[in-house]
């Protein structure tokens, strides 16, 4: 009875491994319910391998320690494993040992050596030498010489001198130059060439006689500017013969300027003009606003003046002060 309980306990824990993955060092646990008498003794039991070279010798955990030779072969085990339910993920049990050899199509373990030959299509390892010959279509390495090709010989830029060899070199025909640089034009005497500079987006001109270049077109006529008048005009006084400056014009002889000149001797005219910004006194008084006291004083003065005029009409003594009022008094 104890052995059957042990078998049931182990059958719930153990998991099966397909027979296709069984090797000499693998272990099998079965949970079948077949009624064959030959397999009744090994159902639900865990077996361990005895010996390194023994492929078919197993020892049961529930049987005595004495060994026995199993008459079953791998073909019988495969037939048993087909009838047994297999789990999706086969994991080793606690009592089982990890197989030494990895399963097929699995990555190597850390302790296993890395294969020396790389797989096809993989880059070379750091220790491997780099192939000397470059692949077709790749640019040359820095240490390799640049292949010599018939590159187009550019025309001289501005502020550069042209060597005599390049000047006398006629290898580049006009047709090739026109194909490479169709924007080159020569003058009538083939002395000056207008060359297009794509970097500056402008033409520069090459003079073959002086072997110089410039951005200005020498064929264009220079703008004729009127010569400067270097003569000076001098005025002298007709009567005194003194030098007359430019500001001494006939306008200085006007009445206003004469009065200004004479009054400057006694008054500071410039300061008085700047005080009211050149405005007249009448305009200044119109814009002026009087206070209440000033208005009362002005009214009182006007009343006094009217009273004095009324009394002067009837007072004869006032004729001595103002003789012009005598006619009014006589009438």
Curated annotation (Swiss-Prot):
Subcellular location: Nucleus
Protein name: WW domain-containing protein C2F3.14c
Biased amino acid composition, Low complexity: 23-41
Main location: nucleus
Composition-biased stretches (Pro residues): 105-145
GO BP term, pick one: mRNA cis splicing, via spliceosome
Positions of region (Disordered): 1-184, 290-309
Keywords from the UniProt entry: Nucleus
Basic and acidic residues compositional bias, start-end: 292-309
Native organism: Schizosaccharomyces pombe (strain 972 / ATCC 24843) (Fission yeast)
Domain WW: 187-220
Domain of life of the native organism: Eukaryota
Any one annotated GO CC term: U2-type spliceosomal complex
Keyword Nucleus: yes
Composition bias type Polar residues, residue spans: 9-22, 57-89, 158-184
Signal peptide: none
């Amino acid at each position: 009875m104890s052995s059957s309980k042990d078998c049931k306990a182990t059958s719930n824990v153990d998991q099966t491994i397909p027979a296709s993955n069984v090797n000499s060092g693998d272990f099998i646990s079965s949970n079948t319910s077949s009624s064959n008498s030959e397999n009744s003794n090994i159902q639900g039991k865990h077996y361990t391998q005895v010996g390194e070279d023994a492929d078919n010798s197993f020892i049961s955990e529930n049987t005595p320690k004495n060994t026995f030779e199993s008459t079953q072969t791998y073909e019988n085990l495969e037939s048993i494993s087909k009838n047994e339910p297999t789990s999706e993920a086969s994991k080793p049990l606690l009592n089982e040992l990890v197989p030494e050899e990895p399963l097929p199509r699995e990555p190597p373990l850390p302790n296993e050596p890395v294969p020396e030959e790389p797989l096809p299509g993989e880059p070379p390892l750091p220790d491997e030498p780099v192939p000397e010959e470059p692949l077709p279509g790749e640019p040359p390495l820095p240490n390799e010489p640049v292949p010599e090709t018939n590159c187009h010989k550019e025309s001289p830029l501005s502020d550069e001198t042209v060597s005599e060899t390049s000047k006398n070199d006629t290898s580049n025909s006009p047709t090739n130059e026109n194909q490479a640089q169709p924007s080159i034009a020569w003058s009538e005497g083939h002395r000056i060439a207008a060359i297009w500079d794509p970097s500056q987006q402008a033409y520069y001109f090459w003079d073959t006689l002086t072997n110089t270049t410039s951005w200005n077109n020498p064929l264009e006529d220079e703008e004729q500017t009127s010569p400067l008048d270097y003569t000076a005009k001098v005025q002298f006084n007709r009567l005194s013969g003194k030098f007359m400056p430019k500001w001494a014009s006939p306008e200085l002889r006007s009445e206003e300027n004469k009065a200004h000149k004479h009054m400057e001797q006694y008054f500071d005219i410039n300061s008085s003009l700047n005080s009211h910004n050149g405005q007249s006194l009448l305009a200044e008084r119109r814009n002026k606003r009087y206070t209440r006291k000033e208005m009362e004083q002005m009214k009182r003065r006007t009343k006094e003046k009217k009273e004095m005029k009324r009394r002067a009409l009837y007072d004869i003594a006032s004729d001595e002060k103002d003789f012009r009022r005598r006619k009014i008094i006589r009438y």
